[in-house]
UniProtKB/Swiss-Prot annotation:
This is Soluble pyridine nucleotide transhydrogenase. GO terms for cellular component: cytosol. It catalyses: NAD(+) + NADPH = NADH + NADP(+). Belongs to the class-I pyridine nucleotide-disulfide oxidoreductase family.
Length: 466
């Protein structure tokens, strides 16, 4: 006789990956429960990561825009806002997102259970509830979408009131005048922009030789120059020897012999998967040193009835990709295989001030691959719309094949870059000869718009051909 389970599938985590999986499963008629350890749905993306940091960035960006606008230059005082005030704006956005996502589950009759899950055996979970009770749940299949958390090295005292990670920084109650940021990855660079935009001194400690080395080098160099021009002090190829907290701040001793002191430290150097409390050993699964699971193309782990999506499987660690991974895993879970697959060229959005966004290959990759490419560029300062709204800092770069005119990569630096990139991405994804830079020359754009940058860049690139 077939075994009777409480659910067809249990999803652990309600972030983008868990939500994508849960919605995909219930739409296919499965009985689904979602387990969330926090009191509200949404996961780290909604409560500690993407949403609050982007809401903070938006508020700071508007303050900068106001202070730099010549319309208000006669005002004797600059517009300023405290970190607490800006956090209130982020809280408002978080609440809206939480209510909306809670509605998704309610409308689709998907059960939400609060507590910490751990595996008892291959088809059984123990749920440690907030009231101290323990429930036992069974399911035929599982989706692990429990996300990640900031990496905490053992020699850094994160209990000190002036030492923060990218989660706890959202609970900061004092107004720093000087911030140390250790780790110049995406999170470190975004918070460097936010704090510098609030006129806080920033020291950005980079353990590598350049910022965001995965980007096209021109984009990385543009960010470095913009940071330098705004007063951010970047220290490349540095690692800490010791971090000590004191009453009025934090002192960082670097292996190079330097010492730095600031009002507080944001440690933003890596993340680790939230798998340590799942008792994965009870179902024969192992994680790597960063708590991440290995999966196949259908997001199955070494146990075929257990799937994993999102940050817990590592690259690309993007909310957008996690949702799609969940949706694909749901299809594979129900039908045995997935016809959908994650797209090859996933766009990257980095919400510094200004933004950076990329899709496709970089110049360095194409040069290494010996692909005959050409470059088309458009400077924002030459666009009427950019001049109107005062967004003169920025550039759009299109890389295309010299012979076939196929678009190979698009890179954008400037305000709204993460929006602008999708116009080019849509053309890059076209099949049957539809991917060509000539599209931007032969179509008509609204005027004045930022989208016009594509026509300008296309003409610039095609004019280089001979």
């Amino acid at each position: 006789m077939p075994h009777s389970y409480d659910y067809d599938a249990i999803v652990i985590g309600s972030g983008p990956g868990g939500e994508g999986a849960a919605m995909g499963l219930v739409k296919q008629g499965a009985r689904v429960a979602v387990i969330e350890r926090y009191q509200n749905v949404g996961g780290g993306c909604t409560h500690w990561g993407t949403i609050p940091s982007k809401a903070l960035r938006h508020a700071v960006s508007r303050i900068i825009e106001f202070n730099q606008n010549p319309l208000y230059s006669d005002h004797s005082r600059l517009l300023r806002s405290s970190f607490a005030d800006i956090l209130n704006h982020a809280d408002n956005v978080i609440n809206q997102q939480t209510r909306m996502r809670q509605g998704f589950y309610e409308r689709n009759h998907c059960e939400i259970l609060q507590g910490n899950a751990r595996f008892v055996d291959e088809h059984t979970l123990a749920l440690d509830c907030p009231d101290g009770s323990v429930e036992t749940l069974t399911a035929e299949k599982f989706v692990i979408a429990c996300g990640s958390r900031p990496y905490h090295p053992t020699d850094v005292d994160f209990t000190h009131p002036r030492i923060y990670d990218s989660d706890s920084i959202l609970s900061m109650h004092h107004e720093p005048r000087h911030v140390l940021i250790y780790g110049a990855g995406v999170i470190g660079c975004e918070y460097a922009s936010i704090f510098r935009g609030m006129d806080v001194k920033v020291d950005l400690i980079n353990t590598r030789d350049r910022l965001l080395a995965f980007l096209d080098q021109e984009m990385s160099d543009s960010l470095s120059y913009h940071f330098w021009n705004s007063g951010v002090v970047i220290r490349h190829n540095e690692e800490y020897e010791k971090i000590e907290g004191c009453d009025d701040g934090v002192i960082m001793h670097l292996k190079s012999g330097k010492k730095l002191k600031a009002d507080c430290l944001l440690y933003a150097n890596g993340r680790t998967g939230n798998t340590d409390s799942l008792a994965l050993q009870n179902i024969g699964l192992e994680t790597d040193s960063r708590g991440q699971l290995k999966v196949n193309s259908m997001y199955q782990t070494a146990q075929p009835h257990v799937y994993a999506v999102g940050d817990v499987i590592g690259y690309p660690s993007l909310a957008s990709a996690a949702y799609d991974q969940g949706r694909i895993a749901a299809q594979a879970l129900v039908k045995g295989e997935a016809t959908a697959h994650l797209i090859e060229d996933i766009p990257t959005g980095i919400y510094t001030i200004p933004e950076i966004s990329s899709v496709g290959k970089t110049e360095q990759q194409l040069t290494t691959m010996k692909v005959p490419y050409e470059v088309g560029r458009a400077q924002f300062k030459h666009l009427a719309r950019a001049q109107i709204v005062g967004m003169n800092v920025g550039t759009l770069k299109i890389l295309f094949h010299r012979e076939t005119k196929e678009i190979l990569g698009i890179h954008c630096f400037g305000e709204r870059a993460a929006e602008i990139i999708h116009i080019g991405q849509a053309i890059m994804e076209q099949k049957g000869g539809g991917n060509t830079i000539e599209y931007f020359v032969n179509t008509t754009f609204n005027y004045p718009t930022m989208a016009e940058a594509y026509r300008v860049a296309a003409l610039n690139g095609l004019n280089r051909l001979f």
